[in-house]
Amino acid sequence: MEYNTSALCDIYLDQVDVVEPMFSNFGGRASFAGQITTIKCFEDNSLIRETLEQDGLGRVLLIDGGGSLRKALIDAEIAAIAEENEWEGIVVYGCVREVDELEDMNLGIQALASIPVGAANQGIGELDVPVNFGGVSFLPEDYIYADNTGIILSPEPLNIDLELDDTVEE
């Protein structure tokens, strides 16, 4: 399904939080949405890999990587695990790598930047904890909507049919 964050903000601005504009799209999906699972980690992607091995249908993995621009938390191998387990997307407050392969995947991936250096695998990180970046506090089980224009967050799922109806009428 396609999502338009601009149209969603036109309808739900009082009900959503808008993440500061700092993310770029690296995945093969222009837009994605779902209920979030949060991870807080710094330059270590072992918990990310472990989490993405679970069923991700209807879910988005939101990673607070501390905004690190030194090591990539997502690479093609980890993204392929997410794609295989039907995750809708990944938002990384940090970096990705192997971007040419990421853009060919049926997966939404938003991140700050890309860098060729990979992350450590030391098992350090926290799962399903509140995280804060981009001027927004993210709670596990919130709903995220992302496209090339931006990222918005809602505590409840948004009625996408309203957005689709407005688009059809125009």
Curated annotation (Swiss-Prot):
InterPro entries: RraA (IPR010203), RraA/RraA-like (IPR005493), RraA/RraA-like_sf (IPR036704), RraA_gpbac (IPR014339). Disulfide bonds: none annotated. Keywords: Cytoplasm. One of its GO terms (cellular component) is cytoplasm. Its main location: cytoplasm. It comes from the Bacteria. One of its GO terms (biological process) is regulation of RNA metabolic process. GO terms for molecular function: endoribonuclease inhibitor activity; enzyme binding. It is found in: Cytoplasm. NCBIfam families: NOT-MenG, PRK09372.1, RraA_entero. This is Regulator of ribonuclease activity A. It comes from Vibrio parahaemolyticus serotype O3:K6 (strain RIMD 2210633).
